[in-house]
Amino acid sequence: MSIRVLIADDSAVMRDAIARTLNADPALEVVGEAASFAETLKQASTLNPDIVLLDLHMPDESRYLPEIVKGPLLENTGCILAISVWNDEEAKSLAKNIGAVALLDKAHLSSDLISSIKMYCMKD
């Protein structure tokens, strides 16, 4: 049985790169992609992914991020991994507030993604 992943990033190029990386591992299955927080909430509630890879900064963040912080995303997924181009204290705090288990730097995503998923989200 594969681990179901929802990719949430406003960049189609980034979503495609992440999907290619994940699809190279037979234990992982990309079940959906979202380009906004609104889409992420909707898809998470219908797809019930095991993992959500969530970009912290998308165009509709001011409207939906407070809603995400309240926890509805966690109700529909087992693990949130935040991704961002920023790794400052503000980003780390935001990742923690939304219930993410870790904040991954987009600059190192290709080398860190699979190992981070296995470390933080895959239970034996």
What are these model-derived regions, one by one?
Residues L109:
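Receiver (REC) domain switch/active-site region of two-component response regulators
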Residues S62-N76:
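Short amphipathic alpha-helix used as the core "switch/output" element in two-component signaling
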Residues R63, W86-L104, S115:
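Alpha4 helix (beta4-alpha4-beta5 surface) of REC/receiver domains from two-component response regulators
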Residues D55-H57:
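Active-site residues of response regulator receiver
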Residues A82-I83:
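Hydrophobic/aromatic residues positioned on beta-strands within the core alpha/beta folds
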Residues E33-I51:
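Acidic, metal-coordinating helix/loop segments flanking the phosphotransfer/catalytic sites
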Residues S2-M14, I18, L22:
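Conserved acidic segment of CheY-like receiver
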Residues D25, L113-D124:
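Receiver (REC) domain switch/output surface
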